[in-house]
Amino acid sequence: MTPLRKTNPLMKLINHSLVDLPAPSNISMWWNLGSLLGTCLILQIVTGLFLAMHYTPDASMAFSSVAHITRDVNYGWVIRYLHANGASMFFICLFLHIGRGLYYGSFLYLETWNIGIILLLATMATAFMGYVLPWGQMSFWGATVITNLLSAVPYIGTDLVQWVWGGYSVDNATLTRFFTFHFILPFIITALVALHLLFLHETGSNNPLGISSQPDKITFHPYYTTKDILGLFLLLLTLMSLVLFSPDLLGDPDNYIQANPLSTPPHIKPEWYFLFAYAILRSVPNKLGGVLALLLSILILMTIPMLHTAKQQSMMFRPLSQLTYWLWAANLLTLTWIGGQPVSYPFITIGQVTSVLYFITILILMPTASLIENKMLKWT
């Protein structure tokens, strides 16, 4: 008798995606990140749903409603810190997932790659709006500074900022609309994830060698379901260690002070996962130039398939390209560190050098290294 998963239309869909999916036999732990991102997304939606039941999106009550969740709601503190630190885990997995795609040449699957970048932008927007909701000092001033960047748009900039704010400053209208978008965006992200997977399953997964996987494939279940469980345990172990031992490690102490439009915090900075982009923004003295550099720091990922000059897909056997890749990764970590430092010497200079190096590595060094390798292998 044919199993139900092969006959029922709905079960067939799940079966082709999670059970009988043909997968390359040699994919490493770096291919676990997709399932971990799915886990993070589900965790964020579930915890967010429970938080929304107790949260009040009103400027006069938002801060105290978060305090109420933490103190009075049954296990409210666990739900709150799972949601806050779950976002950090989400971004760690996202950055590693993108890094894996760059290293092993997965960006050559154009549709999957471009939807992935749209997913990154949607996730960043969701996280930014979520950071505003507790209505602490860093929430308020972070929202003021970042939304103010829209005023750099020529001619319509000021109108655009006031339209986003719903008034002449960040206030109740801003908080309400940010809560609305923060609630709806994860469901849009879920739809984009479905598209991401749809296009991925059209081509099949890449593998570390960067060669065709067609001659040697195995079913996703039980091999990769079992393998993914290890990654899942490591993710949950890290997350629960953060939540139960040091829940505020990645947060900002200023956010425990209620939002006050009359008092500016000494250092306004976003969450750690935006610091690299924030460092690039601050490195350009001109406002419009800074905003463009900020946008390009993410959108430059869309140009990578066009800049791919190598004759091999993966970087596994390309030592020069590996060198440029790890230079870029170290540069990204330096930018993250600089973004959290005050605007003073030597941090300004380091920020400007690393910002320029970020773009040079992607636009010049990586394609040049690939061309040199082609020449050395006599593949020109």
From Swiss-Prot:
Subcellular location(s) of the protein: Mitochondrion inner membrane
Pfam family, one: Cytochrom_B_C
Listed cofactors: heme b
Binding annotation for heme b b562: 83, 182
Oligomeric form and interacting partners: The cytochrome bc1 complex contains 11 subunits: 3 respiratory subunits (MT-CYB, CYC1 and UQCRFS1), 2 core proteins (UQCRC1 and UQCRC2) and 6 low-molecular weight proteins (UQCRH/QCR6, UQCRB/QCR7, UQCRQ/QCR8, UQCR10/QCR9, UQCR11/QCR10 and a cleavage product of UQCRFS1). This cytochrome bc1 complex then forms a dimer.
Name of the protein in its database record: Cytochrome b
Additional notes on this entry: Heme 1 (or BL or b562) is low-potential and absorbs at about 562 nm, and heme 2 (or BH or b566) is high-potential and absorbs at about 566 nm.
InterPro entries recorded: Cyt_b/b6_C (IPR005798), Cyt_b/b6_C_sf (IPR036150), Cyt_b/b6_N (IPR005797), Cytb/b6-like_sf (IPR027387), Cytochrome_b (IPR030689), Cytochrome_b_C_euk/bac (IPR048260), Cytochrome_b_N_euk/bac (IPR048259), Di-haem_cyt_TM (IPR016174)
Matching SUPFAM superfamilies: a domain/subunit of cytochrome bc1 complex (Ubiquinol-cytochrome c reductase), Transmembrane di-heme cytochromes
Main location (coarse class): mitochondrion
